[in-house]
Amino acid sequence: DATVMLTQVVGEFEERAKKNQLDIVVDSPEPPVKIMADGRHLWRVIDNLMSNICKYAMPGTRVYISLEKFNGMVIMTFRNISKSQLNISSEELMERFVRGDSSRNTEGSGLGLSIAQSLTGLMNGNFAIQIDGDLFKAILSFEEVF
């Protein structure tokens, strides 16, 4: 169940988010929301996105995470305001070893989004990133299983 998985992974980041002064707002339908996905892979994808949010989101802001069903698809969206403007394209940001923070003052290798994209593809899902100034949005979509 995608709702339960999302809730569990996000729950593991609550303390870290509070430490970084982030308010996480999750909007999801009542379970079950079923998709065909490998549990370990999906956990890793959500974990990578949440780790990036905790590292790169502007302190004192809200992070919006939504799960919705639309036309036979299940769509997970992660939105946050970045600490600094992202002067990079979404395609470049998903390349291996590329990081969005030019100052490189945070831990990490620049592999998280590339891994998330690869794992999502292995599960027959779609992974997309949208960047608009300092607004970062990651969108995962999978076919809903009935």
Please provide the spans of the model-predicted regions.
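Short conserved segment of the HATPase_c
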Residues: 85-98
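Conserved catalytic submotifs in the C-terminal HATPase_c
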Residues: 18, 23-33
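A conserved beta-strand-to-alpha-helix junction within the catalytic ATP-binding
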Residues: 1-14
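Short beta-strand/loop element within the Bergerat-fold HATPase_c
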Residues: 60-72
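Glycine-rich ATP-binding loops of the HATPase_c
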Residues: 124-132
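Short alpha-helical Gxxx[C/S/T] motif in the catalytic ATP-binding
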Residues: 93, 112, 116
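Short helix-loop "hinge" at the ATP-lid/N-box region of the Bergerat-fold HATPase_c
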Residues: 53-54
